[in-house]
């Protein structure tokens, strides 16, 4: 009998694409599925509840407040009954065979920690993400793979990063690692989880035979909240995981030089950076308690 996979679909204020996301899971050929929709409370929570009510086999977790991406996914992980957990969002639709392809790989490779499909833009069909590689150097570098690299072909390949909106893992591993960090709320939480998975001795793998379609976000600048957490959580990730030799140069670059330049050019964004640094400073005792200085392998960016 196929192992039970719990599919967690996180939803926040987007009832329209949620139906397609649920249907794409139900239509998977994989025979043993447990589906959980987690609603982060919003003004559209009632509409989301109505969508979920159309699918009797789907379990519904309604958070009393918006816990962000990290907290919402953690609520889904806590509710999961499966031996394996696939994390997804309401704006992601699985292509046929997606779960079966990932499960076939994960079951055969005990050293694989996180497995992810290739993520495509739904409108254009172009590759949005096939994973990525990064380096926690004085200047942060993250390279997202948006096309197949020479020599990769259709076979699974190792990466260092996969987006949190489409991850398959063993439930035991996610629970041992305590899922995402709740204090990250949103943005960079997937990067930080990937680092912990790698440091635990597991691999992060992209399976090209598996694919998902991502609904294109509406055009426009990121909100102040998004910018704040994107900056804050990158700084926090360095405190948690970067080599000690890197931290002075990183703080000088991003905490002094970049902040000063940004305040002069764009005061609004500059003060967001100041707030982000202050938040990290106030969280320093907890971050330093959780710090794991073990090195990562060279990123080969």
Predicted regions mapped to residue ranges:
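Non-catalytic, C-terminal membrane-associated alpha-helical segments of glycosyltransferases
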Residues: 245-301
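Glycine-rich, basic loop-to-helix element that forms the pyrophosphate-binding segment
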Residues: 63-80
């Amino acid at each position: 009998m196929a192992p039970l996979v719990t599919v967690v679909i996180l939803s926040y204020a987007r009832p329209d694409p949620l139906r397609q996301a649920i249907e794409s899971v139900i239509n998977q050929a994989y025979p043993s599925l447990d589906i959980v929709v987690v609603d982060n409370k919003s003004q559209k929570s009632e509409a989301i509840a109505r969508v979920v009510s159309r699918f009797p086999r789907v379990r519904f977790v309604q958070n009393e407040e918006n816990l962000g991406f990290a907290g919402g996914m953690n609520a889904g992980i806590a509710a999961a009954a499966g031996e394996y957990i696939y994390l997804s969002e309401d704006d992601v639709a699985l292509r046929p065979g997606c779960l079966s392809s990932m499960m076939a790989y994960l079951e055969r490779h005990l050293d694989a920690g996180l497995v992810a499909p290739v993520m495509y833009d739904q409108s254009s069909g172009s590759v949005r993400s096939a994973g990525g590689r990064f380096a926690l150097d004085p200047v942060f570098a993250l390279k997202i793979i948006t096309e197949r690299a020479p020599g990769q072909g259709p076979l699974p390949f190792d990466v260092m990063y996969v987006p949190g909106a489409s991850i398959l893992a063993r439930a035991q591993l996610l629970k041992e690692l305590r899922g995402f960090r709740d204090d990250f709320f949103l943005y960079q939480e997937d990067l930080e989880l990937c680092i912990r998975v790698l440091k635990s001795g597991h691999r992060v793998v992209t399976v090209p035979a598996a694919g998902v379609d991502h609904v294109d976000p509406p055009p426009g600048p990121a909100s102040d909240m998004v910018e704040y957490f994107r900056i804050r959580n990158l700084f926090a990730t360095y405190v948690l995981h970067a080599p000690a030799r890197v931290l002075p140069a990183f703080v000088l670059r991003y905490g002094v030089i970049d902040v000063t330049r940004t305040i002069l050019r764009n005061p609004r964004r500059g003060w967001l950076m100041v707030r982000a640094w202050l938040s990290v400073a106030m969280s320093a005792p907890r971050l330093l308690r959780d710090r794991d200085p073990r090195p990562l392998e060279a990123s080969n960016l």
